[in-house]
């Protein structure tokens, strides 16, 4: 009997994507994060669906509905903790996935990379609108500060901000539409993930050496399914440890207080995964300049493929580029730390220097480093 997975129209697609897919024989654990992101997305959609069954998107009842989920709904506390900390795991995997792409030159698959950047932006938008939903103090003021940035756009800014708000400030209309956005966006993300995989399977995976791996491929199953299963065990271990032992450690204490438009928290800040971009935003004294720098900090990923000057794809054998990459990593950690600090010296100047270094490394230092490495590899005799 002919194998059904190779003949059935639907099973054939799954077979070519996850079972008989030819994969490079040397891809390391850094290639696990794609599948882990897929698992994170499934966890977020499922836990989110169960939360949406009990949540009410009204300013009067949103906060108490979240409290009701945690107190009265069967395992509601667990579902909520998994959803909140699942977002942190999602972004941890995202940052590592993007970092892997930069280190090993995966960005040279331009279509896959561009869809990936769009995915990153969409996930960030989803996380932002989701953070507003519990209607705690930091939720409300975070929404107010970030949506208010739209008013920096010349001429149409104020109108645009009021259009997003559905009024003259963040209120009931804003919360209702943010809930609608938060519900629909994960399904848009799922569609984009399919397109991301479609483009990836057009070219095949990159590998640590950056050399064309066509001469040495192995089937995805069982080799990489078992390897991904190990990654999944680690992911679940960290997620469950967070959700069960310290579920509020990554959240903001201000969100234990219901939103109060008359009382501004002393230090407004987003969740930890946005702090690097928030630090760049704050490091520029001008409002419009800050907004442009914020956008540039993410959209700069789109220009990375055009700044690749090295003859080698991967940084595996390029020590100068490696050094710059790890300086960039340390710089991003510094920006994350600065984003969580109050706006006072010495944090202001550290944030400004780190922001300048971020753009300098990517735009000015990395391209010549690649060219210099090419020169060093040329025979000199």
Swiss-Prot record:
InterPro entries: Cyt_b/b6_C (IPR005798), Cyt_b/b6_C_sf (IPR036150), Cyt_b/b6_N (IPR005797), Cytb/b6-like_sf (IPR027387), Cytochrome_b (IPR030689), Cytochrome_b_C_euk/bac (IPR048260), Cytochrome_b_N_euk/bac (IPR048259), Di-haem_cyt_TM (IPR016174)
Binding site for a ubiquinone: 201
Single GO MF annotation: ubiquinol-cytochrome-c reductase activity
Further comment found in the protein's record: Heme 1 (or BL or b562) is low-potential and absorbs at about 562 nm, and heme 2 (or BH or b566) is high-potential and absorbs at about 566 nm.
Co-factor note (free text): Binds 2 heme b groups non-covalently.
Region forming the signal peptide: none
Keywords: Electron transport, Heme, Iron, Membrane, Metal-binding, Mitochondrion, Mitochondrion inner membrane, Respiratory chain, Transmembrane, Transmembrane helix, Transport, Ubiquinone
Domain of life, per lineage: Eukaryota
Protein name: Cytochrome b
Purpose: Component of the ubiquinol-cytochrome c reductase complex (complex III or cytochrome b-c1 complex) that is part of the mitochondrial respiratory chain. The b-c1 complex mediates electron transfer from ubiquinol to cytochrome c. Contributes to the generation of a proton gradient across the mitochondrial membrane that is then used for ATP synthesis.
Cofactor(s) listed: heme b
Matching PANTHER family: CYTOCHROME B
Binding site for heme b b562: 83, 182
Transmembrane segments: 33-53, 77-98, 113-133, 178-198, 226-246, 288-308, 320-340, 347-367
Record-level GO cellular component terms: mitochondrial inner membrane; respiratory chain complex III
Membrane topology: Multi-pass membrane protein
GO biological process entries: mitochondrial electron transport, ubiquinol to cytochrome c
């Amino acid at each position: 009997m002919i194998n059904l997975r190779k003949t059935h129209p639907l099973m054939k697609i799954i077979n070519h994507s996850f079972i008989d897919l030819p994969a490079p024989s040397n891809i390391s654990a850094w290639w696990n994060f794609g599948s882990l992101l897929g698992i994170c997305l499934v966890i977020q959609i499922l836990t989110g669906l169960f939360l949406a069954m009990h949540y009410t998107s009204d300013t009067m009842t949103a906060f108490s509905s979240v409290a009701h989920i945690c107190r009265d709904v069967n395992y509601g506390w667990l579902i909520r903790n998994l959803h909140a900390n699942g977002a942190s795991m999602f972004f941890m995997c995202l940052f590592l996935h993007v970092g892997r792409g930069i280190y090993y030159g995966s960005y040279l698959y331009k279509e896959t990379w561009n869809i990936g950047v769009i995915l990153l932006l969409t996930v960030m938008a989803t996380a932002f609108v989701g953070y507003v939903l519990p209607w705690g103090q930091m939720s409300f003021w975070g929404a107010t500060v970030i949506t208010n940035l739209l008013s920096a756009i010349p001429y149409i800014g104020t109108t645009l901000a009021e259009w997003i708000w559905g009024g003259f400030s963040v209120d009931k209309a804003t919360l209702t539409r943010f809930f609608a956005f938060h519900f629909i966006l994960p399904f848009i993300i799922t569609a984009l993930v399919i397109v991301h995989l479609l483009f990836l399977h057009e070219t095949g995976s990159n590998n640590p050496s950056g050399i064309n791996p066509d001469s040495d491929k192995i089937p995805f199953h069982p080799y990489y399914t078992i390897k991904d299963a190990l990654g999944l065990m680690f992911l679940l271990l960290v997620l469950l440890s967070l959700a069960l032992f310290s579920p509020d450690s990554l959240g903001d204490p201000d969100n234990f207080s219901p939103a109060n438009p008359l009382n501004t928290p002393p230090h407004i800040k987003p969740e930890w995964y946005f702090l690097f971009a928030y630090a760049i935003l704050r490091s520029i004294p001008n409002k419009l300049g800050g907004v442009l720098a914020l956008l540039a900090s993410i959209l700069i990923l789109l220009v990375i493929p055009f700044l690749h000057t090295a003859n080698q794809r991967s940084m595996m054998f390029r020590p100068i580029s490696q050094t710059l990459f790890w300086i960039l990593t340390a710089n991003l950690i510094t920006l994350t730390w600065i984003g969580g600090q109050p706006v006072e010296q010495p944090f202001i100047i550290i944030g400004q220097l780190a922001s300048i270094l971020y753009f300098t490394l990517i735009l000015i230092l990395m391209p010549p480093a690649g060219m210099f490495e090419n020169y060093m590899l040329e025979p000199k005799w």
